[in-house]
């Protein structure tokens, strides 16, 4: 294993450890640990992307931008008690737009008819959830509506990529749906919803990023080394 790939794998291990610590903090109601671990998710995923890409591309830039917006949603929302929900919605709305733009070329190249057909109902799920949450959204309704459209678009485009992007997009959709129920439909919230929201969000986010990295034509460890030559052996 090359040194850069070792670092890449170590970053995935660090991400998994941060997620496990965060979920443990939620279960134990350890507020300080929760606040420390959540802002670590996006920077670790950014480092995963940076250690994988052999050169800067449109897709990698969009992935990093999306992760920066996700970091803002994870971090800044918790610092603003009054407007935390709005900051989170707008930050993740921007992240979803970036991810959709990154997924669109992949969807055009490798779309799988079966996965796309299975993803079509996502629009209905998002519309139904939006209608149910509309009354509780209050003044945030326009932002929630824009987020719902971006979420459905990202989930649909993720289905046309590969298995990891599809699973990641689906879990992201599930996480956002449960969070919306928590915020705007308190009576419909499920037990331990906060824990389930973070489990589906962190795994979905990781799979979405991993799927887009996997779809890159080359990674740093698979690119040809400088000066490498093609040798043809004839019998």
Task: Name each model feature, range by range.
Residues 1-235:
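Polytopic alpha-helical membrane-helix bundles and their juxtamembrane interface segments
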């Amino acid at each position: 294993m090359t040194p850069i790939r070792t670092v890449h794998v170590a970053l995935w291990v660090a991400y998994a450890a941060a997620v496990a610590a965060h979920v443990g903090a939620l279960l134990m109601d350890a507020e300080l640990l929760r606040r420390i671990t959540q802002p670590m998710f996006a920077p670790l995923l950014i480092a995963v992307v940076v250690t994988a890409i052999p050169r800067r591309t449109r897709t990698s830039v969009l992935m990093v931008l999306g992760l920066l917006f996700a970091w803002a949603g994870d971090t800044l929302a918790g610092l603003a008690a009054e407007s935390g929900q709005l900051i989170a919605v707008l930050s993740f709305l921007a992240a979803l737009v970036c991810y959709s733009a990154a997924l669109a070329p992949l969807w055009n190249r490798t779309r799988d008819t079966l996965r796309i057909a299975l993803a079509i109902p996502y629009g209905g799920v998002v519309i139904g959830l939006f209608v149910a949450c509309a009354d509780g959204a209050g003044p945030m309704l326009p932002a929630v509506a824009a987020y719902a459209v971006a979420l459905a678009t990202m989930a649909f485009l993720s289905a046309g990529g590969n298995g990891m992007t599809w699973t990641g997009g689906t879990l992201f959709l599930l996480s956002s749906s449960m969070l919306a129920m928590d915020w705007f439909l308190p009576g419909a919230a499920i037990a331990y919803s906060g824990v389930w929201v973070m489990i589906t969000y962190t795994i979905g986010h990781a799979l979405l990023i991993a799927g887009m990295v996997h779809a890159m034509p080359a990674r740093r460890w698979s690119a040809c080394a400088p000066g490498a030559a093609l040798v043809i052996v004839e019998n």
